């Protein structure tokens, strides 16, 4: 397996729609010249942006977290340019970008140091061969203070690894439960 470069990411996005919308280079300023947390293609990865839809974890309904029987009332929905995650809490969001992963590629997501250095951890499971959709992002606020997440700005980096052989069964082949997801997607069994 080899990590893929900016040239490969650009070509796959422009010719095959691997990342839509695709941002060339690292975007660091908005149209008014204000600083952003960077997003777009980098040397060996792609920094994704967070959309304006969030689900923030709450316990107003005294729910129990059960991945086999998840209660949607465990979250409150927020649509905003900024999401405030309560101390020691959790939020879900999604990428602005829609991904179509090639059959011989595995994509791994890592958090951005800008957030990690503030105690905000991003978790995403690997994007498997032939998976497609908006990526659901999981944010953990590990601090005892409220934390901000900015929509429209970089939140995580995707790394693309191309295998030297094609897998026998892709995510699409086995009918993966998150195939084609749009919006923030809650746990499924």
Curated annotation (Swiss-Prot):
Keywords per UniProt: Hydrolase, Nucleotide metabolism, Nucleotide-binding
CDD domains registered for this protein in UniProt: trimeric_dUTPase (cd07557)
Reaction it catalyzes: dCTP + H2O + H(+) = dUTP + NH4(+)
SUPFAM superfamilies: dUTPase-like
Pathway assigned in UniProt: Pyrimidine metabolism; dUMP biosynthesis; dUMP from dCTP (dUTP route): step 1/2
InterPro entries: dCTP_deaminase, dUTPase-like_sf, dUTPase_trimeric
EC number: 3.5.4.13
Primary role: Catalyzes the deamination of dCTP to dUTP.
Family note: Belongs to the dCTP deaminase family.
Matches recorded under HAMAP family: dCTP_deaminase
The protein, known as: dCTP deaminase
